[in-house]
């Protein structure tokens, strides 16, 4: 029997891709941990984990009907911070700063329900692959049936309608119409 040792498959992965994969895992763990504890009237909008300069920032974006106050963010920080300390094993490779805040005017739309609620709103949609040579659309969300977003957007001076398959969407957020 011929023994050649282990087979090593080489794949070139950029460090940015490795960091993105690790950050996705951290985001998933944090989301699963904090979601059950963020109760009505609050809604968890998004969890982000990014490096800014030499610091790591864990941002938890929360909203409620009528908007979130500074007191709300303080109360939520007091709930969330101890929860993060209970995660075992600790998913954070470095110390981080916790930031609990409002998602702001350009809030991300992460779920099908948030897209359905946004029908009639002005949005920004980034795609994995271009449709008709366009990778980012910004316009009014006319409809969303769970599978397709219908957007009225301005192409130079003409209004156009585009139907975008939901699985083609990389990122969606509210946008400010100027």
UniProtKB/Swiss-Prot annotation:
Keywords: Cytoplasm, Ribosome biogenesis. It is found in: Cytoplasm. Signal peptide: none annotated. Gene3D superfamilies: Ribosome maturation factor RimP, C-terminal domain (2.30.30.180), RimP-like superfamily, N-terminal (3.30.300.70). The keyword Glycoprotein does not apply. InterPro entries: Ribosome_maturation_RimP, RimP_C, RimP_C_sf, RimP_N, RimP_N_sf. GO terms for cellular component: cytosol. GO terms for biological process: ribosomal small subunit assembly; translation. Disulfide bonds: none annotated. Pfam families: DUF150_C, RimP_N. NCBIfam families: PRK00092.1-2. PANTHER family: RIBOSOME MATURATION FACTOR RIMP (PTHR33867:SF1). Belongs to the RimP family. Required for maturation of 30S ribosomal subunits. This is Ribosome maturation factor RimP. It comes from Streptococcus pyogenes serotype M1. The gene is rimP.
């Amino acid at each position: 029997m011929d023994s050649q040792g282990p087979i090593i498959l080489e794949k070139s992965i950029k460090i940015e891709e490795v960091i993105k994969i690790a950050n996705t895992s951290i985001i998933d763990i944090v989301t699963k941990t904090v979601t059950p504890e963020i109760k009505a009237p609050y809604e968890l909008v998004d969890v982000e984990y990014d490096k800014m300069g030499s610091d790591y920032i864990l941002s938890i974006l929360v909203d409620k009907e009528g908007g979130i106050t500074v007191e709300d963010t303080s109360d939520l920080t007091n709930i969330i911070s101890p929860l993060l300390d209970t995660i075992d094993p600790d998913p954070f490779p470095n110390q981080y700063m916790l930031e609990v805040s409002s998602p702001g005017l350009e809030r991300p739309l992460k779920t099908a329900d948030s897209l359905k609620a946004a029908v009639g709103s002005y949005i920004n949609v980034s795609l994995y692959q271009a449709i008709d040579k366009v990778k980012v659309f910004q316009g009014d969300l006319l409809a969303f049936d769970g599978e397709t977003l219908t957007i009225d957007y301005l192409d130079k001076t003409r209004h156009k309608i585009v139907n975008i398959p939901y699985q083609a969407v990389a990122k969606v957020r509210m946008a400010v119409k100027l």
